[in-house]
Swiss-Prot record:
One Pfam entry name: Biotin_lipoyl
Residue ranges annotated for the Biotinyl-binding domain, each copy included: 2-69
CDD domains, A to Z: biotinyl_domain
PROSITE patterns: BIOTINYL_LIPOYL
Protein's UniProt name: Biotin/lipoyl attachment protein
Organism: Bacillus subtilis (strain 168)
PTM entry text: Can be both biotinylated and lipoylated on Lys-35 upon overexpression in E.coli depending on the growth medium; the nature of the modification in situ in B.subtilis is unknown.
UniProt cross-references to InterPro entries, sorted A to Z: Biotin_Carboxyl_Carrier/Decarb (IPR050709), Biotin_lipoyl (IPR000089), Single_hybrid_motif (IPR011053)
Residues bearing PTM N6-biotinyllysine: K35
Alphabetically ordered keywords of this record: Biotin, Lipoyl
Amino acid sequence: MTVSIQMAGNLWKVHVKAGDQIEKGQEVAILESMKMEIPIVADRSGIVKEVKKKEGDFVNEGDVLLELSNSTQ
């Protein structure tokens, strides 16, 4: 299970780390695109197994941000 990026831009802030429990609808990161801050929201619940991108990375639509385990949805 993964949480992916919805649009291209710079990954400005990541709010979670490996081992964190996240809930569906929780803001997990902020993307900066076209001088706007766009929240990245988890579309499922689970435990963060791995954060695949780091702050400052340029990301594309569809890139995997988080790998999750023990998803409850």
